[in-house]
């Protein structure tokens, strides 16, 4: 007499043999990395004020502001790098006898600082050699931007003169 478990096992094997071959299906999966370059700054306003010197007869210090960061995401094709340029709009200027300077302090692996530049209407390299990277999204992630109002000669400063300039940072292929 055949035991019930053995009978069921034999029946299952017989059904598999009678059912024919096991069928399968395939799916082609296509994955593509889109080309994009995104950039933002963490602050929309920077204020630089020339204040009185600490002692009478002294020269005022050049005001600076390092509270803004440029954040970017940039996958690149093999052999391609990107850069960040900076310029101000036509008609913008610094106060009389002053220049607006900008320096980017770049985190490791996120490009190379071009050093301190003098802002003008001509776009200048601020960060170069940006490969595939994402700088992060927290308030202090990315390339730290230091704006400095450099005083040329104190004798040419105009008291109460105020200028507002729109600085455009552009992330583009090198």
Label each residue range with its predicted role.
Residues 10-17:
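Bacterial N-terminal signal peptides
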């Amino acid at each position: 007499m055949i035991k019930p478990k053995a009978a069921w096992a034999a029946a299952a094997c017989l059904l598999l043999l009678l059912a024919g071959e096991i069928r399968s299906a395939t799916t082609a999966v296509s994955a593509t990395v889109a080309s994009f370059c995104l950039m933002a700054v963490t602050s929309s306003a920077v204020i630089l004020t020339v204040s009185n010197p600490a002692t009478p007869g002294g020269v005022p210090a050049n005001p600076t502001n390092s509270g803004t960061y440029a954040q970017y995401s940039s996958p690149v094709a093999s052999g391609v790098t990107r850069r960040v340029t900076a310029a101000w709009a036509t008609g913008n200027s610094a106060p009389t006898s002053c220049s607006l300077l900008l320096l980017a302090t770049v985190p490791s692996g996120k490009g190379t600082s071009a050093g301190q530049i003098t802002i003008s209407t001509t776009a200048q390299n601020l960060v170069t050699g940006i490969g595939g990277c994402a700088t992060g999204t927290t308030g202090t992630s990315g390339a730290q931007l230091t704006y400095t109002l450099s005083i040329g000669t104190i004798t040419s400063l105009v008291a109460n003169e105020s200028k507002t300039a729109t600085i455009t940072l552009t992330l583009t292929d090198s």
